[in-house]
Amino acid sequence: MELAARQEKKLLSTKNMVIMAMFGALSGLLMYFQIPVPFAPSFYKLDFCDVPVLIGAFAMGPAAGAVIAAIKILISLVLRGTQTAGIGELSNWIQACSLAIPAALIYRHHKSKASAILGMAAGVAVMVLVGCFTNTYILLPTYARAFQMPMDALIGMGTALNPRINSLAAFVLLAVAPFNLLKGSLVSLVTALIYKRVSIVIKNRL
């Protein structure tokens, strides 16, 4: 309990709150730069908005990563609104937390390059697994209901890109899982390349 209280106090320090706000704002802006992928429907777009989330989680802990991810979603909703009845934004937050929290938990116990790489690999794996589960049982069914779309029509959007996508399970395995694997891997790669320099700035100048 005492350790948890100290960690909460540190997280809520003025410096960390400022950094989380800055990283959340940067992450929200990065959501504007989206790249479509050829193997998934158009509402799956690749971006690098989770790089600040992952950096913040490494620097300040897993809870900070979740807060930064929430800030980016709030900024996106305020500036752009939603075209997915909030489902896309919820999915984005879940993805970010699934990647950043396991990575930060592993890195926190032994802060080394090897630990960071192991953490990011674990984070990507969790991101893929959580993405498969939530899309199968929560996100895609909710999306279909929100837009009064038969699930077959949603699956058909995947079939148009890949004839092997002929069921919800195939949609998740051949579109959702590769998308999360690609995004998580690219975000982790960029984070690995820039984290050391950014962390020095956080410690020495902010």
Task: Set out the residue ranges of the language-model regions.
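Loop-helix junctions at membrane interfaces
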Residues: M1-L206
